[in-house]
Amino acid sequence: MTAQNENAQAQAEQVEVANEAQLEQTAEVQQEQPVEAELAAAYARINELETYIAEADNREKDIQLRAQAEIQNIRRRAEQDVEKAHKFALEKFSKELLTVVDNLERGLNALDTAVTDEKTQALVDGVEMTHKEFISTLAKFGVEAVGVVGEAFNPEVHEAISMQPAEGIEANHISVVLQKGYTLQGRVLRPAMVMVAG
């Protein structure tokens, strides 16, 4: 019996060793499955975070581009405002000077018919020089006269008082200038009052 007992005992040990091996193998498989699941979850989280970081980078770049564009727009508007301020700072002053020019021209027109002696002619010459210098000074600052007989009528710079037929002048052209108009850097200070050939 001893041999049978030994045999049975050996078989029992083999079964026990086999069971232990099977339990270890099952435990390893069970341990591997949660590890693989955790690893897959970790990779998914990594991908999610990388996507979030990429989106955040894109948002940041977009915000920076918009901020730079806004800064450029602000600079451009400020430069335009300064340019307009310089360009048209003289507008009100120039408008006031136009009445002086008008009066000088009226005086010259009246004196042309009244000149009878040298003293009066010297006075006329002095007023003419003053008028020319005045017009020259205005031109230096961008003030220019508009409204010349024969020029095409332009409603942006001319104000038509009436239309009448005129010999030698095409239709829709200025036939008579009642009051000169002026522009400052291309901007109308005062429209020319004119009669237009019809």
UniProtKB/Swiss-Prot annotation:
PROSITE patterns reported in the protein's UniProt record: GRPE (PS01071)
Protein name stated in the entry: Protein GrpE
CDD domains from the UniProt entry: GrpE
Family membership noted in the UniProt record: Belongs to the GrpE family.
GO (cellular component) term, any one: cytosol
Highest taxon above the source species: Bacteria
Gene3D superfamilies per UniProt: 3.90.20.20, Head domain of nucleotide exchange factor GrpE
Species for this entry: Actinobacillus pleuropneumoniae serotype 3 (strain JL03)
Protein encoded by which gene: grpE
GO function terms (MF aspect): adenyl-nucleotide exchange factor activity; protein homodimerization activity; protein-folding chaperone binding; unfolded protein binding
Cellular localisation: Cytoplasm
